[in-house]
Each structure stands twice: as structure tokens, then as C-alpha cells.
Amino acid sequence: MKGKYHFKVYNKKLLFEFDINRNITFIQGNSATGKTTLLNMMYDYLLSGRGSGITVETNAKFMVYLRKSLTATWKQELGNLTDTIIFIEENNRFIQRSDFTKFVKESGNYFVFINRKALKMLPYSVTEIYRLQNEYSEEEKKQVYTLQQRYPTLTYMNGNVNLIATEDSNSGLEFFSKVFNNIEITSTYGNTKVISFLENIENTDILCIVDGAAFGCFIKDLISTCNQHPTKHITYWAPESFEFLLLTAKTINFPELDKILKDTYNYVDCIKFVSWERFYTFLMETKSNGQAAYDKHSITQFYITEENINKVLKIFPKSIQLLAQAGKEYKTMNLF
């Protein structure tokens, strides 16, 4: 299953309108923010159609699983579904189990979790965690609910960074070491170890770089760690992935690259790629060749030439560019 899917769910008083872009989406928020109302409306529509007083307009097949059935297990109810967007509420404990995790990764369906807790065994994007926001629309004469991204991909930096910690221990680490040549750089050796690394390290003024496409399950913990250790001055940057940066910077080029980057959801088959991070790695490994052949385990000289480093720098956020520029100025000053 791949693609972007639009939903418009409404009755006489309420309207929910949103898009689902990836195979795993979270809608979070406190009680009484509309999450359960949305699920109940969609569930009632599935049971009774427009006779329920509810309309669902969408280009997707969908299923709503509210609670454990008295007569069937989740496997019996969901196991045979394909190419379907499955909405699941948070009271279902089975979503924490390894067999359900396997189902999410291999079934070829999309999943929308109405869930306040992270699912640590699933790789999902920082940008696909939402909260519902609402306002009254005079045009619609309804209370209108839309999705708002919950977490930023870049937090404010005061300009001082003494340590950069990246989850990558291979090509990404080597590349960033070349770019930020006046700042100490280290690896946390995977996204599962980012939090413990930050909690235990004594350094201050730390920039943490993570692959946002698969870091959603840890982002709340990362923000909590930043807040719990204010004297460490921890900030973070969560681009989709290192390979995404290389592709966006056009360090390599091939037909349809622009279309793929603009509408990635149309190209990522979730039964083949559980996250966009893996898809971008696949592109780099299969679309590069010769001197530009990409190796995730060790950066090749092609990608750390001045020309390609500058290409990548141009697509960095401004505050990250300034860090790298400070490194260049420092290096130049040391030559004289």
C-alpha cells in the first residue's frame, strides 16, 4: 500500500478533515479533544452508513477497531485486511505486543493510532504525530477539526554548540565530522540509545541529530530529557534521514528524483519499506554507481568533496548552516 489519503468526516455539527501520508500515524492529545468522537463517528458510519447521520468522504478503504470483541480476536478481525487504513484506539493493549508489531510491519496496511503512549517497537516519523485543533467555521456552520503536527523537527539554538551527537555511527557520522570540523562529534550508536546517552553525558550545549523518519517513538522522551536537564542546553534536529539530505541536495541525480522527494508517499510501498528512512537508503544504494556508489557503512570520498558538502549545506536549516560556517572560519583562521 502506498499513497496519500484524504478524509472528510462530518455530521450536522462537526467536521473532521485530514490527510494520512504514511503507513503509521499517531493522533494524540488530552481527553475531550475530539479523538474518541472522530473514531466513534467513523465507526458508526461503517455500521450504518449515511443512515447514522454521518458522512465519510475518502479515497481509502478503512476500518475502525475500537475495543476487543467478545467473539473474535484482533487477528481474526484485522488479519485478512489488505490495502486498508486501520484506526485503532488506545485502550487496546495488544498494540504493545510483538505479534501485533510484526503485523503492522508486514501486513501492507496503513495504521492510525489514537494513542497517547509511544509504541517503542515501531519506526514512525516525528512529523506524523499530530494533535487535533478546532475552530468554528462560519462557512461550514460547524466546529471544524484538523490535524496539527505536534513536535518540531528543529529546536531553538542559542548559537553555542560544544558537542554534536548523532544516532548514526557510519556514513552520517563521517560526513558530519567533515562538515562541523571545529566541534566534537560522537555517535549514540542507534536511536534506542539517544536518551541514555544524553542523560549520562556531562557535556553542555549539545546538538542531537536524529533520523526523523523513524524517531517518532522516542521524540517525547527526547523533549522530556531536554527539559529535565536545562543546564545541558540540549537541542535537536530531526531531518528525515541522512540519505534524505544527500538526495535533496542532489549529490546524485536521476529521473523522477524531484517527484519522489515532493510526493514520497506515492513511491513508498509500506510492505517493502516500514519507514521512509529505509526507502531513502534504498534509493541511495540503488541509484548511485561508480565513484558515487553509496555505502551506508562508510562514506566515500565522492560525498565529502567541497562541492558536495556545499550542496548539502545549502539545504540545512539556517542555524545549522551557521554552525558549519563557524567551523570553516575557524579552520581558515588557523591557517595564518
Which residues does each PLM region occupy?
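Structural recognition of the conserved hydrophobic beta-strand(s) that form the central parallel beta-sheet
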Residues: 87-89, 108-119
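Hydrophobic anchor at the beta1->P-loop junction of P-loop NTPases
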Residues: 27
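Conserved P-loop NTPase "ATPase switch" module shared by AAA+ and STAND
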Residues: 66-98
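Post-Walker A alpha-helix
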Residues: 38-40
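N-terminal pre-Walker A segment at the start of P-loop NTPase domains
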Residues: 1-16, 138-141
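Acidic, divalent-metal-binding catalytic cores of TOPRIM
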Residues: 92-93, 127-336
